[in-house]
């Protein structure tokens, strides 16, 4: 219960941050492995800068009859501001768990917790808003309803997206339970995908955060190279290399860098996203001397995760997420 209270307090604080946000559509996320925290808790933080539905609803779990269906609505994260469209149904499972719903659903009764940031990616190559079914908030809700661990949540969201299609832009989810944290990233199947094509309806991968490290992401794909020889620390979608190979985005024998293939990072000289990740590491791992860099440079100069200078407390995360991250730095206006 102690860990659950801390997780809930942290998530509630992040939700409150979102209500005061400006319409910049920018998000900063932080994850802390259990051996990197002061009390052995895993922690996930997510600030949402944008106009999303900040109302919190407790969606009750329960048992369900055979043949029951689940309604899927387009873009439910903004359903407080406009009508949402019913786009399809999928079969319900026998049992679901109670979860907290808001613009981006964030935690269930089993302690599975999700943070989120958007990176959109290469729309021309991967976006499919016509024949694919799920937006990211749909997958979050379904994962939280059906999963009792972080790894199971990743697997459920990935499998559903492959079967029914992913209709949103590129997204990153920080998926945690009391023991571990997985960083899940997903991109669409391309505009010509259909459910009966025999091809997966999404391209996703996930990478485990080491227990003694912290992770940060901010509106850019962060997974980097996928190690297909390390299934203990990486997961990936069916035939993930095939479509990028067809497009000429990847050549057999080269490292499979998810961030380069599915996001538009190369040649990007902005500091908008990388500056926020840099500031998190600057605050929590200052002794390592990370230097500010642009989006393209961040792929090699800012790590996926890093050991903090000292054990991280809940108060440390509150401070990181609530302060103006650029204040008194090279990025300060």
Ranges and model annotations:
Residues 300-333:
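Long, well-ordered mid-to-C-terminal structural blocks that present hydrophobic/aromatic surfaces
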Residues 153:
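Aromatic- and Gly/Pro-rich donor/ligand-binding loops
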Residues 27-135, 156-312:
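A contiguous strand-loop segment
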Residues 126-129, 138-147:
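Second-shell loop/turn segments in exported
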Residues 1-11:
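Bacterial N-terminal signal peptides that target proteins for export
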Residues 17-26:
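Sec-dependent signal peptide cleavage junction
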Residues 20, 166-170, 330:
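Intrinsically disordered or highly flexible coil/loop and linker segments, enriched in small
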